[in-house]
């Protein structure tokens, strides 16, 4: 969860904090966590495969995790993070509302889609990180750093320092993200729901 799950866990916590601040002036926080982890590339069936398409050299860390978060207002979030997924990094967020659905394709960002029957068509052109082949449908970012929000994050940090305010990705978000991930590991190890003290 720490290596791959911190981004989606942080994203859902950020959205609930923002919702709470807009509705009542205080963030909606995570109340409990249920989680599980696994090392799917270490199971015998995968180890027996002669050709391995998935990254499998990780040591002392899971390559699959899932966490169910329950928030103070009773809403839920299901977060999965994994390396055992062909086609590169996937960071997808779906919010199901009582009056709509919001689908966010953080990565792959689908603003640009390209196709080639053979990866050699693209030559040395960079497509995206952690993709095992350039063949088939691909989702390159016209400006990967901008599309992933790195300049915007830095701009907010500089503005926060200049204006004397907390950045959008501030200390409470960082603290709660780490707290939820740690609680997730405790849940996975002990096989139980972990309640967070508030």
Task: Map each language-model feature to its residues.
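Rossmann-like dinucleotide-binding domain that binds NAD(P)(H)
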Residues: 1-76, 81-88, 172
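A structural signal for well-ordered alpha-helical segments within the folded catalytic domains
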Residues: 2-10, 148-155, 172-179
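A residue-level signal for beta-strand positions that form part of recognition/binding surfaces
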Residues: 30-32, 92, 101, 193
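NAD(P)-dinucleotide binding in Rossmann-like oxidoreductases
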Residues: 37, 55-65, 71-152
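Juxtamembrane/interface motifs at transmembrane-helix termini
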Residues: 50, 97-99, 124-125, 188-197
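C-terminal helix-rich "cap/oligomerization" subdomain common to oxidoreductases
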Residues: 72, 143-145, 156-198
């Amino acid at each position: 969860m720490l290596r791959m799950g911190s981004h989606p866990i942080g994203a859902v916590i950020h959205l609930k904090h923002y919702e709470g601040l807009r509705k009542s002036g205080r963030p909606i926080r995570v109340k409990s966590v249920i989680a599980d982890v696994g090392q799917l590339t270490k199971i015998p069936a995968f180890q027996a495969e002669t050709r391995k398409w998935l990254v499998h050299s990780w040591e002392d860390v899971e390559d699959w995790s899932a966490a169910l978060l329950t928030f103070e207002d009773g809403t839920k979030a299901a977060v999965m993070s994994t390396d055992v997924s062909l086609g590169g990094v996937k960071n997808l967020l779906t919010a199901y509302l009582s009056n709509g659905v919001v689908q966010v394709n953080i990565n792959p960002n689908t603003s640009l889609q390209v196709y080639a029957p053979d990866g050699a068509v693209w030559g040395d052109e960079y497509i995206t990180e952690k993709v095992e082949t350039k063949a088939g449908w691909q989702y390159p970012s016209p400006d990967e750093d901008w599309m992933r929000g790195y300049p915007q994050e830095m701009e907010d940090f500089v503005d926060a320092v200049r204006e004397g305010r907390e950045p959008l990705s501030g200390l409470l978000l960082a603290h709660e993200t780490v707290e939820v991930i740690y609680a997730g590991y405790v849940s996975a190890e002990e096989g139980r729901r972990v309640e967070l003290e508030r």
